[in-house]
Amino acid sequence: LFLLDSDVVKKICQYHLLHELAAALGCGLNAFAVLPQLKFQLRLADVAKAVQKLGSQEAVDQARELVAAAAEVQVVAEAANPILGLNRPDIDSGEATLFAALHDVDADSLISGDKRAFIALSEINGVAVVDVLWARLICLEEAMHLIVQSANFDHVSAKVRANLAVDTAIGIAFGRATANSPAMVIEALASYMSDLHARTSGKYVLP
C-alpha cells in the first residue's frame, strides 16, 4: 500500500491529480491507505463545507472517490510499536500514526507533505526501526516529479497552474506568471528534494 497523509490527499485532490498519481505509481485507488480522520478533516459528509475546504466540486469528488476505495490506516497497540514510543513533539499524531503503520508493514510506502516530520525523524539517530523507514518515504515534490514523468506534461502543468494557491513551492516550480518548461519543472522539483535530503542529514533517499 501507499499510505497518504492528509496534506498530500488535500493538495493532490485540489490539483485534480489523484488518478495521475495512481498511474504514476502503477496502482489503483485501492492501493492507497488514508487516516481514518481524513473524511472529517476534509468535511466530506457536507458538500458545501467540503467545497469550501477543497476549493472545487471536482476536488471533493476525487477526495470522496479516494476515501471510498482506499484502506484506512490501522496501527497495532502502542506497546507493540516502537515508533509510537518515540514521543517527538515535532511529529504530530497523524504523521506518528503513519510512521508506525510503515513500521508494521515492510512493503508499504508513505507519501507525506509534512517536511517538518521528516526533519524531526532525521534527528533520531542510531535507532534501527527508524533508519529502515527512509527508503519508503516520499515527499510531495517527489510525488509530483513522478506524475510529471509519467503523465502528459501540459495537462499536469495546466492543472497545477490553475490552482497556484494550493502549494507555494509547487506553484513556483511550474511557473506562476508564465508556465515553466518540463526541464525547468523537473529541475525545480529535484532542487526541493535535494534540499530535503540536506535538511535530513542525507537520510531522505533521492529518486
Residue ranges and their predicted role:
Residues 1-108, 115-207:
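Active-site-proximal, substrate-binding regions of enzyme catalytic domains
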